[in-house]
């Protein structure tokens, strides 16, 4: 099984958590694209979706899945999204695709977070994948200095503007032993919109694509 086939298996496995007549929260990324393909097969059975990025919105609309603004939706039964890293406590690093803020907002609304990954994303300790931080542009240098004080090595992701019009600093060389604490510390820096640690709101169910099939962790 190739890595993409493992992603596809995890994406399709998430369909079992989609409730009939519900509005589904949908994340962003290569694994989620497989989930969107799967979701299109039952678009007649759901009311539609809320998306965490312009890219996912475009893909869903092209497949005929109705996409709603989050402000017009009271609740979501599930949010399905991938991760760049996930540990044994269901804490994640997300935001490799720069959609972390919208992903975090949609995840906060959903009753259940279903994380879909291939087996390369499982780690014991978060931090080998650089931690994305969304920053208001004028605060870039200040925030970078504060991130250095926290032990990180921030690098400006050149040429990337988020869907919210902000920039991304990728923080390298962090061994993240206390994800919740670090998530709060970084979010407390003035000028930070949010960071890619999903620890205060981690995953509820993990679906891992492996060469032997999909493994479920709860």
Curated annotation (Swiss-Prot):
GO terms for biological process: D-ribose metabolic process; pentose-phosphate shunt, non-oxidative branch. GO terms for cellular component: cytosol. Substrate binds at residues 28-31, 81-84, 94-97, 121. Pathway: Carbohydrate degradation; pentose phosphate pathway; D-ribose 5-phosphate from D-ribulose 5-phosphate (non-oxidative stage): step 1/1. This is Ribose-5-phosphate isomerase A. Coiled coil: none annotated. Its EC number is 5.3.1.6. The keyword Iron does not apply. CDD domains: RPI_A. Belongs to the ribose 5-phosphate isomerase family. It comes from Shewanella piezotolerans (strain WP3 / JCM 13877). Catalyzes the reversible conversion of ribose-5-phosphate to ribulose 5-phosphate. Keywords: Isomerase. It holds the Pfam family Rib_5-P_isom_A. Gene3D superfamilies: 3.30.70.260, 3.40.50.1360. The active site is at residue 103. Homodimer. SUPFAM superfamilies: D-ribose-5-phosphate isomerase (RpiA), lid domain, NagB/RpiA/CoA transferase-like. It catalyses: aldehydo-D-ribose 5-phosphate = D-ribulose 5-phosphate.
């Amino acid at each position: 099984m190739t890595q993409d086939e493992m992603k596809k298996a995890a994406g399709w496995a998430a369909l079992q958590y989609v409730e009939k007549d519900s509005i589904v929260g949908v994340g962003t990324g290569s694994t989620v694209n497989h989930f969107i393909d799967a979701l299109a097969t039952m678009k007649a059975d759901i009311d539609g979706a809320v998306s965490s990025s312009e890219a996912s919105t475009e893909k869903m609309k092209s497949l005929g899945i109705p996409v709603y603004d989050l402000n017009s939706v009271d609740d979501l039964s599930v949010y399905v999204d991938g991760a760049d890293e996930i540990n044994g406590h269901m804490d994640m690093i997300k935001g490799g695709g720069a959609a972390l803020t919208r992903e975090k907002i949609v995840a906060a609304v959903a009753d259940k977070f279903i994380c879909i990954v291939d087996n390369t994303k499982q780690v014991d300790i978060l931090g080998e994948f650089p931690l994305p931080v969304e920053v208001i542009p004028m605060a870039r240098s200040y925030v970078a200095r504060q991130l250095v004080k926290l032990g990180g090595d921030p690098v400006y992701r050149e040429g990337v503007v988020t869907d919210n019009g902000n920039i991304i600093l990728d923080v390298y060389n962090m061994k993240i032993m206390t994800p919740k604490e670090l998530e709060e510390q970084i979010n407390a820096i003035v000028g930070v919109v949010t960071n890619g640690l999903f620890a205060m709101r981690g995953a509820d169910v993990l679906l891992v694509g492996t060469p032997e099939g999909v493994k479920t962790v709860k």
